[in-house]
Amino acid sequence: MIIYRLTTSKFSGDLSGEGAKIYGGRWNPVGLAALYLSEFISLSILEILVRANKYNSPDSYSLLTIQLPEDSVNSIELKKLKTGWQNHIEYTRSIGEDFIRMNQALVLKVPSAIVPQEHNYLINPAHKDSKKIKIIVVELLELDKRLFQI
């Protein structure tokens, strides 16, 4: 399976999940390492933009094309999430926390809060299969500055 990670270039080689551990994310609480990836490059960009504002200058971003074993993916179906889940971050964090702490799979496929019909992937970097994560390509991705003026 091929998925994508968009990150500031200075962290392009870091698959430790330390950023999410420090700041937390939609699917993980502060203190618990996780990696976030997307099924599409465009969704990766949207996930960056949703946290940006018009006063942020776009940093240098790198796009990582990553290969994962398909047999290491658990999924959460959109219909199984409670109504309004996008607005209940403690709810989604508890799901991700349970996934990471149970340590039964490397990857959790989750709906995107921005485009629920598309998916992000939460990776548990502490899982024994994390060594199977293969970075295929790392390339500089220059985001159109107009995206940050919205």
Where does each model-flagged region fall?
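Active-site and NAD+-binding cores of ADP-ribose-processing enzymes
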Residues: 2-17, 29-30, 57-150
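Short glycine/proline-enriched, acidic/aromatic patches that form the donor-sugar handling elements
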Residues: 24
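Short, intrinsically disordered, mixed-charge
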Residues: 43-57, 140
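Extended catalytic/binding region for NAD+/ADP-ribose chemistry, centered on the ART fold
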Residues: 27-47, 121-126
